[in-house]
Amino acid sequence: MKRYCLIFAATTLFSFISPKTLKGTWQFAGGIYNGKKEGAPEGYALQRKYTARHYQAFVIEKGAKPEKYEAGDYALNGDSCIDTETFCSQPSKIANIPIPYLYTLRNDTLTLKGTLPTGMQVQEYWIRIR
């Protein structure tokens, strides 16, 4: 009986431990921007490849070479993900500005929710593909 209680307690505790990284490849599945719901783009995909502390974002079009459009650093702290864009292929108002997001992981879905420095409220959904 003690053994079962110990196993139950350990399982319960481990279920509350957050991952230390987002390592892997994630594909954009849609989001909510200032209250307006938007689906994933059609005809191409947006993917982020996370390492232990950095990420690179790509536009993936069938038959074309992936095009990097963004890169940056991130850090996980509790339920927060601090994202700092260090490269953008387009002019950006958020370059080198740390942006805190509330993040959640459920199964293979990453949700990032926060407010950009421009005031825009975002909630994005990313699906792990690798």
Predicted regions: what is each one?
Residues 72:
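Phosphoinositide-binding peripheral membrane targeting modules
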Residues 4-13:
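Sec-dependent N-terminal signal peptides
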Residues 13-69, 82-130:
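Lipid interaction determinants
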